[in-house]
Design a protein with these regions (language model features):
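Active-site HxH/HxHxD metal-binding segment of metal-dependent hydrolases
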Residues: 2-80
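Generic hydrophobic alpha-helical segments
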Residues: 174-176
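N-terminal-biased segments
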Residues: 61-63, 84-89
Length: 176
């Protein structure tokens, strides 16, 4: 795009969602993250960098630097960003997929970037399944037309949420 990059949103502390932030630094954007993001990045960055470098021969990755958020959103708070012709809301969620999940919601188009709070396949369960389901229940109540997941294709909200909510509900009931 020819438009300036004002914000880079690090949606959570998994490497496929934060590596590459350096590519935008020449624009001097605000780096937005959850209030718990920097702590998680600091404790996991070197491990993720080594792991990725062992799997991918890439000088850029080997020389990657830790980029921390300079705008930190408190849990359950929303940062509204005016992009001129639209306002986007960046929300910090309670612990679910990770303890530092952010989403982005475009009020104008009712498009919701869910990062990995929603994915189009059975998710990896490494966090709070009860918290994750709670967050999905909250998303279901939002006025959303389209969901852009962290992995997978853009989908209509109801098509996206019904199967994953059923999966979590069944898993929770059968594990207890």
């Amino acid at each position: 795009s020819d438009l300036p990059i004002s914000h880079v949103v690090i949606t959570h502390s998994h490497p496929d969602h934060f590596f590459g932030t350096e590519a935008f630094l020449s624009e001097s954007p605000s780096i937005v993250g959850h209030e718990k993001l920097n702590r998680s990045l600091l404790s996991n960055f070197n491990f993720y960098k080594e792991l990725q470098s062992n799997n991918i021969e890439n000088e850029v990755l080997k020389n990657a630097k830790l980029i921390k958020a300079n705008i930190k959103i408190k849990t359950e708070n929303i940062l509204k960003v005016d992009l001129g012709d639209r306002i986007v809301e960046i929300k910090a969620w309670k612990s679910g997929h990770t303890d530092n999940d952010l989403s982005v919601y475009d009020l104008k188009t009712k498009t919701f970037w869910s990062e990995n709070i929603f994915v189009d396949r059975i998710p990896s369960i490494r966090a709070s399944i009860l918290g994750w389901k709670r967050n999905l229940d909250e998303i279901q109540k939002m006025d959303i037309d389209l969901i852009v997941p962290g992995h997978g294709s853009v989908v209509k909200k109801d098509v996206a949420l019904t199967p994953i909510l059923a999966y979590f509900t069944r898993l929770i009931s059968q594990v207890r």
